[in-house]
């Protein structure tokens, strides 16, 4: 796993963002941090990361925002948050009932190609928006797909805010509804960040 500080200005509050598969900061770089520091974790080829999590203890308030596969991965780290938001993901993200159906996921790995990756990114949106320019290596993204099959969420972790898009073509909306037991509350595709201008809107 990798990390990157998106805003590090010595604020008393920090937003911890667990990104989705294959992504970098391009999907959320437009969000204003306001009076919060922001750190992003991404690239789940391994869960080992060269980061001292005790650094986060200096913040008086820690907020979690996780998206897609990051919803599961965030639960695997022992961090106490003031609030936690799950966006278009579940704790069973590769699952016939609660996530991406297993057969579809395996077929995605088997047939993964640069063209397939580009189609995936396009399918994250349900409207004509400028697609993010993700600067991740193809082979790294491909191996990350396989690595994610090896992880299981900490089911004791509790999210207190759930955001579900009504037209998610990646993790089917109906499967998210089945997992969380709430109706969709965002009018978008899998990547909803273009609906927002500030991180605080996601807390």
Can you describe what each PLM-predicted range is?
Residues 170, 185-203:
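Catalytic histidine-centered segment of alpha/beta-hydrolase-like enzymes
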Residues 64-74:
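Gly/Ala-rich beta-loop-alpha elbow adjacent to hydrolase catalytic centers
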Residues 27, 73-77:
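Hydrolases whose catalytic domains are alpha/beta-hydrolase-1, hotdog thioesterase
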Residues 80-111, 133-138, 144-149:
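Flexible "cap/lid" loop of the alpha/beta hydrolase fold
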Residues 29-30, 158, 169-181:
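Short alpha-helix in the alpha/beta-hydrolase fold that links the catalytic acid
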Residues 162-168:
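Short beta-strand/loop motif that positions the catalytic acidic residue
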Residues 1-59, 190:
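Active-site catalytic motif of lipid deacylating hydrolases and related acyltransferases
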